[in-house]
């Protein structure tokens, strides 16, 4: 029997990272939900306000809007730019409460003398003259982009879920060992006796161990970053050495400021590495690379270097906050060194409908996004989810989810680790 969306049957989302939460927002924005208001439950091991955990990368990574749409991929370019426009307007309206900050972004390229054409569509785009290029840099551009503070952004998603559902969406902290456990009394006591109409599996690395999924193609890509406090730096910098390859190739060094004065420095890509603690030698390497692309991180350089420009609501320095004086100034700025596991997958993202559970519950997979969370949240997955929704009987689901509404809650973000 094909699953149907009887409005009395719950929809269950497994996972409460940025993928799971944005999936919930999408469902709540749908015409079907507004008409029928089926129960929606989120079941997760980790929640946004939990202590930092390498397996829950959503709150650890640096994040910014930085498209990697190929020049020939016109559709993805349109999605990414529309997302930027919506997010930029959110920042203009809400300021730091949005979890976003507009800033000048500088992209440095080593070993190549061109850039993605989508950068030229951003405000304030310019190509840096050769005379202004740092040592060993072959090409550079700058433009206005957006940085995100994940904890603030995720908190806003949680508030949206509550608001859109009139506090009817239930979030349960529960370790689900296997999909068949959804019929266990300990779960039915939470979600009701009716079997779920649909289960959305947004578990990231959890897909490796979740019974009934056990996807052996899932693996961690370890990322280490350094969080410092340097509120005088309000511009973002990225250096790409080698082929970009969709944002995951070569070596990338980045400096991502946040609205609260923190800065994320990174990063690393270590496939299959489960070590959850920072490595001291990696921290030193990140600091060295970050200083190469942004000397203003070191307060001593502020005497001879101009302050990074800002497009933000906040001043560069708070009234009572001055650059510290210290023998090792970068060491004095460090808040923490952090490790997170990108939920990577051989073969790429799994976004598809699988076999029904017990012949009565539709199963939709949405995991394996690695560091490219934005591709998980843009227009292409929307269309796939709509396709699955129609097969499930979500008639008219898209009627209430136009492009503007969808992108306003599900942005194109690049999570950096």
Swiss-Prot record:
<feature type="binding site">
    <location>
        <position position="19"/>
    </location>
    <ligand>
        <name>FAD</name>
    </ligand>
</feature>
<keyword id="KW-0285">Flavoprotein</keyword>
<dbReference type="GO" id="GO:0019478">
    <property type="term" value="P:D-amino acid catabolic process"/>
</dbReference>
<dbReference type="InterPro" id="IPR006076">
    <property type="entry name" value="FAD-dep_OxRdtase"/>
</dbReference>
<keyword id="KW-0274">FAD</keyword>
<feature type="binding site">
    <location>
        <position position="57"/>
    </location>
    <ligand>
        <name>FAD</name>
    </ligand>
</feature>
<dbReference type="GO" id="GO:0019740">
    <property type="term" value="P:nitrogen utilization"/>
</dbReference>
<feature type="binding site">
    <location>
        <position position="58"/>
    </location>
    <ligand>
        <name>FAD</name>
    </ligand>
</feature>
<dbReference type="GO" id="GO:0005737">
    <property type="term" value="C:cytoplasm"/>
</dbReference>
<comment type="function">
    <text>Selectively catalyzes the oxidative deamination of acidic amino acids. Protects the organism from the toxicity of D-amino acids. Enables the organism to utilize D-amino acids as a source of nutrients. Enables the organism to utilize D-aspartate as a source of nitrogen and may also contribute to utilization of D-tryptophan, D-tyrosine and D-asparagine as a nitrogen source. May play a role in its interaction with the host.</text>
</comment>
<dbReference type="GO" id="GO:0071949">
    <property type="term" value="F:FAD binding"/>
</dbReference>
<comment type="similarity">
    <text>Belongs to the DAMOX/DASOX family.</text>
</comment>
<protein>
    <recommendedName>
        <fullName>D-aspartate oxidase</fullName>
        <ecNumber>1.4.3.1</ecNumber>
    </recommendedName>
</protein>
<feature type="binding site">
    <location>
        <position position="342"/>
    </location>
    <ligand>
        <name>FAD</name>
    </ligand>
</feature>
<feature type="binding site">
    <location>
        <position position="373"/>
    </location>
    <ligand>
        <name>FAD</name>
    </ligand>
</feature>
<dbReference type="InterPro" id="IPR023209">
    <property type="entry name" value="DAO"/>
</dbReference>
<keyword id="KW-0560">Oxidoreductase</keyword>
<dbReference type="Pfam" id="PF01266">
    <property type="entry name" value="DAO"/>
</dbReference>
<dbReference type="GO" id="GO:0008445">
    <property type="term" value="F:D-aspartate oxidase activity"/>
</dbReference>
<feature type="binding site">
    <location>
        <position position="62"/>
    </location>
    <ligand>
        <name>FAD</name>
    </ligand>
</feature>
């Amino acid at each position: 029997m094909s699953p149907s969306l009887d409005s009395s049957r719950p929809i269950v989302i497994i996972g409460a990272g940025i993928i799971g939460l944005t999936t919930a927002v999408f469902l709540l924005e749908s015409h079907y939900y507004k008409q029928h208001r089926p129960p929606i439950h989120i079941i997760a091991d980790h929640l946004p306000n939990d202590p930092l955990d390498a397996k829950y990368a959503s709150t650890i990574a640096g994040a910014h809007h930085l498209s990697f749409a190929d020049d020939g991929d016109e559709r993805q370019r349109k999605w990414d730019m529309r997302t930027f426009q919506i997010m930029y307007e959110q920042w203009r309206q809400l300021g730091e409460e949005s979890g976003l900050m507009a800033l000048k972004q500088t992209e440095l390229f080593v070993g190549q003398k061109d850039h993605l054409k989508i950068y030229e569509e951003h405000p304030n785009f310019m190509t840096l003259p050769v005379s202004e290029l740092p040592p060993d840099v072959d090409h550079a551009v700058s433009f206005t982009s957006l940085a995100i503070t994940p904890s603030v952004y995720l908190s806003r998603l949680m508030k949206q879920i509550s608001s859109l559902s009139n506090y009817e969406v239930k979030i349960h902290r529960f370790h689900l060992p296997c999909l068949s456990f959804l019929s266990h009394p300990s779960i039915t006591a939470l979600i009701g006796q009716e079997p779920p109409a649909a289960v959305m599996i947004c578990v990231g690395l959890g897909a490796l161990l979740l019974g009934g999924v056990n996807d052996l193609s899932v693996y961690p890509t370890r990322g280490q970053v350094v969080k410092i406090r340097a509120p005088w730096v309000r511009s973002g910098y990225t250096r790409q050495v080698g082929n970009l390859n969709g944002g995951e190739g070569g070596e990338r060094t980045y400096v991502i400021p946040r609205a609260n004065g923190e800065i994320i420095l990174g990063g690393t890509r270590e496939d299959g590495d489960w070590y959850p603690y920072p490595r001291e030698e990696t921290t030193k390497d990140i600091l060295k690379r970050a200083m190469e692309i942004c000397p203003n991180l070191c307060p001593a350089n502020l005497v001879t270097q101009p302050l990074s420009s800002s497009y933000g609501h906040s001043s560069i320095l708070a009234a009572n906050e001055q650059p510290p004086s210290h023998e090792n100034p970068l060491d004095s700025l460090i808040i923490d060194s952090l490790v997170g596991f990108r939920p990577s997958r051989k073969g790429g993202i799994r976004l598809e409908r699988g076999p029904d559970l017990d012949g009565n519950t539709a199963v939709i997979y949405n995991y394996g996004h690695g560091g490219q969370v934005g591709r998980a949240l843009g227009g292409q997955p929307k269309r796939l989810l709509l396709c699955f929704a129609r097969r499930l009987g979500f008639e008219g689901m898209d009627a209430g989810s136009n492009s503007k509404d969808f992108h306003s809650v599900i942005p194109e973000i690049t999570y950096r680790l």
